[in-house]
Swiss-Prot record:
Keywords: Amino-acid biosynthesis, Aromatic amino acid biosynthesis, Cytoplasm, Transferase. 3-phosphoshikimate binds at K28, S29, R33, S169, S170, Q171, S198, E312, H339. SUPFAM superfamilies: EPT/RTPC-like. Pathway: Metabolic intermediate biosynthesis; chorismate biosynthesis; chorismate from D-erythrose 4-phosphate and phosphoenolpyruvate: step 6/7. Catalyzes the transfer of the enolpyruvyl moiety of phosphoenolpyruvate (PEP) to the 5-hydroxyl of shikimate-3-phosphate (S3P) to produce enolpyruvyl shikimate-3-phosphate and inorganic phosphate. This is 3-phosphoshikimate 1-carboxyvinyltransferase. GO terms for molecular function: 3-phosphoshikimate 1-carboxyvinyltransferase activity. The gene is aroA. Phosphoenolpyruvate binds at K28, G96, R124, Q171, R343, R384, K409.
């Protein structure tokens, strides 16, 4: 065990205004969707720019255990689809995309496929997806609607109509849509919950299906997918815009400038909302064909916003709000209690520990800026909590992030990129 693992990671303090260009790795959301679609396709797929991180490594390991061929050619992966076969044991880690997307795909396999993961993964919601898959004809064994789960595969999924309460996670809908083209009959998915969070992630799923020749109809709340082949070909993964959040926040915190090359002009990624959100908080955001440049202003403004569509951005936005000129209110994010940790409780606890004034409400956070001081910032094994501590450390001396290694879930190179930004 290293000294950093024992004592925590001293978050570096910026010596002045940050002025940096940060090249980000590929999108986790796009990478794992692309891997599942490639595994279910009618022909091989080349994936370029895919993210190499724990979540994607777990996805590839799971697909390989089901018989899918994945050759690593350095700058791309060549995925050779195959009939999925058990028996297999899938380690989901803490990856929601693995425990939901791959579980749905396993209903097409022959034989038994078991799923389990990290202790926290056993607490993450899964029952609505299991119920919906059963409505489509899948056979599953579970205890209490959470991991561990065993899929008893017959080699096909009958299809038909299902309803799902996706209030806890839009990944339930995406999982059903991803497997739907391989069902025996058309699949209709209806959302019956009170709210539907993270809609851009469903939009991404639909767009990626259509790009591969799948016929998908419907809008938020109801979707219909026709059975048919999924095309292969070449897929280019965009940079991970949500993982850009802490780096772009550095521009606001230090009054500096950060540029992210290859930011897409049009995208379905939820992280693209950073352009509007950071502008509202006082930044200047300039997008052109080569990338996005964010320049911080003299102060950070508080933010009053419904963030249900972009909840993965909330930890970074909370750090900015703690340093702002007026209180902030974040709404529509009650589902964050079921993320890698209860992020609402965790953010309230850690910001308060450093001298902040934060209240976790039923569906959000109220953050009242106060003078902050150094101290240990606990990550709760959550990559976005860890990067939040790094943002605060830019201007609050003495912050030590516990378990910075958890960033390996989606960005193993975070510390290298972060320290490089400050050189």
């Amino acid at each position: 065990m290293t000294t950093t693992e024992l004592t925590g990671w001293p978050a570096p303090t910026a010596s002045g205004r940050v002025d940096a260009v940060v090249h980000l790795p590929g999108s986790k959301s796009m990478t794992n969707r692309a891997l599942v679609l490639a595994a279910l396709a009618a022909e091989p797929t080349a994936i370029r720019g895919g993210l190499r991180a724990r979540d994607t490594e777990l996805m590839m390991a799971g697909l390989r255990s089901l018989g899918v061929g994945i050759d690593d050619a350095g700058d791309m992966w060549l995925v050779s689809p195959a009939e999925l076969r058990g028996p297999a044991a899938i380690d989901c880690g803490l990856a929601g995309t693995v425990m939901r997307f791959l579980l749905a795909a396993a209903t097409l396999a022959t034989g038994e496929v078991s799923f389990d993961g990290d202790p926290r993964a056993r607490e993450r919601p899964l029952r609505p997806l299991l119920d919906a898959l059963r409505q489509l004809g899948a056979e599953l064994r579970d205890t209490g609607g959470r991991l561990p789960v065993t899929v008893v595969g017959s080699g096909h999924l009958p299809g038909g109509h299902c309803v799902v309460d996706a209030s806890a996670s839009s990944q339930f809908v995406s999982a059903l849509l991803l497997v739907a083209p391989r069902a025996d009959t058309p699949v209709t998915v209806g959302h019956v919950g009170r709210t539907l969070p993270s809609v851009p992630h469903i939009t991404m799923t639909v767009a990626m299906l259509r790009e591969r020749g799948v016929e998908v109809a419907g809008t938020d709340g109801s979707w219909r997918v026709q059975p048919g082949p999924i095309r292969g070909g070449t897929v280019q993964i965009e940079p991970d815009l949500s993982n850009a959040a802490p780096f772009l926040a550095a521009a606001l915190v230090t009054g500096g400038r950060v540029r992210v090359p290859d930011w897409p002009m049009r995208t379905t990624q939820a992280g693209d909302a950073l352009r509007d959100l950071l502008t509202a908080m006082g930044a200047r955001c300039e997008l052109d064909a080569t990338g996005l440049t964010v320049t911080g202003g003299p102060v950070i403004h508080g933010l009053d916003a419904d963030l249900r569509d972009v909840s993965e951005l909330v930890p970074t936005l909370a750090a900015l709000a703690a340093l702002a000129d007026r209180p902030s209110t974040f709404r529509g994010i009650g589902h964050m209690r079921g993320h890698e940790t209860d992020r609402l409780a965790a953010l309230a606890a850690e910001l308060t520990r450093l001298g902040g004034d934060v209240t976790a409400t039923d569906d959000g956070l109220v953050i009242r800026p106060r003078p902050l001081h150094g101290g240990v910032f606990h990550s709760y094994g959550d990559h976005r909590m860890a990067t939040t501590g790094a943002v605060l450390g830019l201007v609050i001396p003495g912050i030590v992030v516990e378990n910075i290694q958890t960033v390996a879930k989606t960005m193993p190179t975070f510390v290298e990129l972060w320290t490089g930004m400050l050189r």
